[in-house]
A protein has these predicted regions:
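Charged/polar positions within long, soluble alpha-helices
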Residues: 44, 48, 69-76, 94, ...
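Glycine-rich cofactor/substrate-binding loops
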Residues: 2-38, 99-100, 267, 282-446
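A short structural micro-motif
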Residues: 62-70, 231-234, 391-396
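A helix-coil-helix interface module used to build multimeric assemblies
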Residues: 1-203, 208-214, 221, 277-278, ...
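A general structural motif at alpha-helix termini
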Residues: 60-61, 217, 273-275, 362, ...
């Protein structure tokens, strides 16, 4: 049975071990390849300050690359009796290479090791989310342009209000996601800082070259103060969680609209048959289950910042085991959100719109504001025009003119989709994902 990295001459109670480890072994599989990547940078730095020989470094790097390949391919496992991913990697190195495998932990604590793993994992997953957000923005804008001239009712208080268009509806969600991307970029900025070298939260007596590991791992900068680096555990996850929650909020709202507009009482859009499910008793049913599940899962993601806040609430400075619990809600959230983004993009691309909604007379009254504005533009005082049209509606004599002419920025006739696209693309470019990829690939090269 492998010993714990911290074990001395007292064996821990089995029940205590099960309780304290919890689901950490399973969750650590999310972090496996990032743990290896961090170790590669760390030992490269250790060799530069004389704590490893060049031959030892070459041997360790070769074995770590093999472990990385297993982790990347999903073949990495944490053996029974091994506490976490850090212990498994060190065990494999020691088993295969002997005593040199025991040297990789010099100048490092599991505290800064897991901090590093989480940051490397998070920035990689942020990239996945950002790419899927951009794909959904693209589909929404394509539909907005395709149906830019198709009018639909706009609502306030769920009451028919004023003319809108599918160009506006699709485009509104594209712009909302473009704004959400700005928050995700801010979260990425705090994520892409190197905590390695903070050790247990108070640094090391070894002359660690933190600038070197920052450069090797493609970080923008480092968490400079070693105490703050440890204070960032939980804080950074919460910052990222707020960004994920913003995206989830937009997608959940869109899913609600789609379910509503797809219902027979609205009939504004039609979802593809292959994206709906049936009923075991009602043969006519085509249920929007995908959008309903997207809504539910995105609503759950919106609770993530509060869950993290409550776990870390009122903790003083330093590391506490409470923080382990954050991994259980935080790590799976990225895949949950990207799954929702993929499904939403797929269905939006195939969604059909009803181009004849306004043939129904029940929507005639929404053109009342257009008539009031026309009368006011002709010289009638606005309040008099408002009263005149209101009386016509009450008397049932109002005859709408359904030809509208909106030209100002962001209106039915001037969607500004090109500006929103440029804004989203500029935000995406600022992430600088390419520089991170280049650094990681260089580190992995033999």
């Amino acid at each position: 049975m492998p010993t714990k990295l911290w074990e001395k001459n007292v064996q821990v109670n089995d029940a205590i071990e099960r309780f304290t480890v919890g689901h950490d072994r399973e969750l650590d599989l999310y972090l496996a390849k990032y743990d290896v990547l961090g170790s590669m940078a760390h030992i490269t730095m250790l060799e530069s300050i004389g704590l490893l020989t060049a031959d030892e470094l070459r041997t360790l790097l070769a074995e770590l690359r093999a472990i990385y390949a297993d982790a990347d391919a999903g073949r990495f496992v944490i053996e029974d009796g091994v506490e976490d991913v850090h212990s498994e990697v060190e065990l494999l190195l020691t088993r295969r290479l002997g005593d040199v495998g025991k040297k990789i932990h010099s100048g490092r604590s599991r505290n800064d090791q897991v901090l590093l793993d989480l940051k490397l994992f998070t920035r990689d997953k942020i990239r996945d989310v950002a790419e899927h957000v951009m794909a959904l923005i693209g589909e929404l804008q394509a539909q907005s342009e395709r149906h830019r001239n198709v009018l639909m009712p706009g609502y306030t208080h769920l009451q028919v209000a004023m003319p809108s268009s599918f160009g506006l509806w699709f485009g509104a969600y594209a712009e909302s996601l473009a704004d959400d991307l700005v928050l995700l970029e801010a979260a990425y900025r705090t994520t892409n800082r190197n905590p390695l070298g903070s050790a247990a939260g108070y640094g090391s007596s070894f002359p660690l070259d933190r600038e070197m590991t920052t450069r090797l791992l493609g970080f923008d900068s480092m968490d400079y103060n070693v105490v703050y680096a440890q204070m960032g555990r939980g804080k950074n996850e919460r910052t990222v969680a707020f960004a994920l929650a913003g995206i989830a909020g937009t997608v959940a709202k869109m899913a609600f609209d789609a379910c509503l507009f797809n219902s027979q009482n609205f009939g504004f859009v039609k979802l593809p048959d292959e994206c709906t499910t049936g009923s075991s008793i009602m043969p006519h049913k085509k249920n929007p289950d995908v959008f309903e599940l997207i809504r539910a899962r995105c609503n759950r993601i919106q609770s993530l910042p509060e869950q993290i806040t409550l776990i870390m609430n009122n903790l003083p400075v330093g590391y506490f085991r409470d923080l382990q619990e954050i991994k259980e809600v935080f790590l799976p959230a990225f895949d949950a959100l990207t799954d929702c983004l993929v499904m939403a993009t797929y269905i939006i691309h195939r969604m059909k719109v009803n181009e004849h909604i306004l043939d129904d007379a029940r929507y005639d009254a929404m053109f009342s504001v257009e008539e009031v504005n026309r009368l006011a533009a002709g010289g009638m005082p606005f309040r008099d025009a408002y009263k005149k049209v209101g009386l016509e509606i009450e008397a049932g004599t109002f005859v709408p003119d359904k030809h509208i002419h909106h030209t100002h920025a962001g209106s039915i006739g001037n969607l500004c989709n090109d500006r929103v696209k440029a804004m989203a693309e500029a935000t995406f470019a600022r992430f600088g994902f390419g520089r991170v990829t280049e650094a990681e690939q260089k580190l992995l090269q033999p």
